[in-house]
């Protein structure tokens, strides 16, 4: 009797001889129909290739919220950015809020982080089981995931930034809070800034400012894990030299007389001055966008202090190690 081939070998042999059906070869494959392939050098810089838009420079007047009904005023640049709105940058949405006395306004974005600065007025905040008062000059932060009700005891206006556009881009919902609602009272924030401004070497620093922090984010020293909020002063008759960073800055002007301005541009000359800058004249209550990577310097040609509040996505950028903040060196 001739020896039989082992069953396992027979099985492998049959498998090797099996051919793909010609009908299957011509059938569309759903798993690959979205696949694309691009030549590297023409695709590695989509901004340079004009496949994606640059962050536009823009300013927003305080007249947008000076009067009228209780409302949210989105500072919306989504058309220029080519993304769903409202969005002021690719990952952030800045807004003015107006809440008339006796009214309430509900905020419930799909966001991880929300920051408010109280421009004027007073009222209260309620998010889930947490409630606290607010008044002019306060900062406060709110996590996402729960609706927040802002009630005005006196007509209130606020500057409000969240990261909803980032979550829209990521396609994510169901936020898990990384921090609790947190208030930074005006008196404490102003005292912290005053202490920094009175230090002997303050005038030699690139900026005279304090960063709002939260104990949950010791690595980034930022107000939330995504957002950075800075409270800065530009003293009378002073210049704050150029610096740049890869985070977008959504700047709010909390105080300043005519004669205070910012110069913004993409390049420095050999002396550390901005080449062909755009000038932004400050007006109390306005906001403006400083695009990522742009050099910017502040000038105060008046005899009074001026105040600026930049809110950025620098919490996230710092954690990703991509902030790349640089300071001009001038003679």
Model-derived segments and spans:
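A short, N-terminal "cap"/entry segment at the start of jelly-roll beta-barrel domains
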Residues: 9-89, 171-231
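Short, low-complexity cationic-aromatic patches
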Residues: 28-32, 85-88, 103-115, 130-131, ...
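Conserved short histidine dyad/triad with adjacent acidic residue
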Residues: 75-83, 93-110, 230-246
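Intrinsic, low-complexity N-terminal interaction/targeting segments
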Residues: 86, 91-96, 105, 114, ...
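A short beta-strand-loop-beta hairpin characteristic of the jelly-roll/cupin
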Residues: 104-136, 253-284
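Conserved metal-binding segment of the jelly-roll/cupin
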Residues: 133-154, 161-164, 280-302, 311-313
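Double-stranded beta-helix
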Residues: 153-213, 224, 257-288, 301-331
């Amino acid at each position: 009797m001739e020896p039989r081939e082992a069953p396992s070998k027979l099985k492998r042999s049959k498998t090797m001889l099996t051919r793909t059906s010609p009908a299957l070869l011509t059938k569309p494959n759903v798993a690959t129909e979205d696949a694309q392939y691009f030549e590297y050098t023409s695709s590695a810089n989509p901004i340079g290739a004009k496949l994606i838009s640059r962050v536009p420079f823009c300013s927003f007047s305080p007249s947008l919220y000076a009067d009228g009904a209780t409302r949210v005023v989105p500072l919306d640049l989504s058309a220029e950015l080519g993304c769903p709105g409202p969005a002021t940058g690719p990952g952030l949405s800045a807004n003015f809020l107006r809440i008339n006395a006796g009214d309430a306004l509900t905020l419930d974005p799909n966001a991880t982080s929300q920051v408010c600065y109280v421009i004027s007025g007073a009222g209260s905040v309620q998010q889930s089981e947490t409630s606290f008062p607010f008044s002019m000059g306060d900062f406060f932060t709110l996590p996402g995931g729960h609706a927040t009700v802002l009630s005005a005891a006196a007509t209130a206006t606020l500057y409000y930034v969240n990261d909803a556009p980032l979550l829209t881009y990521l396609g994510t919902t169901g936020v898990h809070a990384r921090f609790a609602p947190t208030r930074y009272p005006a008196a404490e924030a102003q005292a912290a800034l005053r202490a920094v401004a009175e230090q002997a070497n303050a005038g030699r620093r690139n900026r005279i400012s304090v960063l709002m922090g939260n104990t949950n984010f010791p690595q980034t020293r930022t107000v939330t894990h995504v957002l950075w909020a800075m409270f800065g002063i530009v003293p009378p008759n002073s210049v704050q030299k150029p610096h740049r960073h890869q985070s977008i800055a959504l700047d709010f002007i909390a105080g300043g007389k005519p004669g205070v301005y910012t110069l913004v541009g993409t390049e420095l000359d050999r002396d550390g001055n901005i080449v062909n800058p755009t000038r932004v004249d400050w007006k109390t209550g306005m906001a403006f966008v400083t695009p990522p990577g742009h050099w910017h310097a502040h000038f105060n040609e008046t005899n009074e202090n001026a105040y600026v509040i930049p809110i950025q996505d620098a919490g996230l950028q710092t954690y990703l190690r991509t902030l790349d903040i640089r300071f001009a060196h001038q003679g």
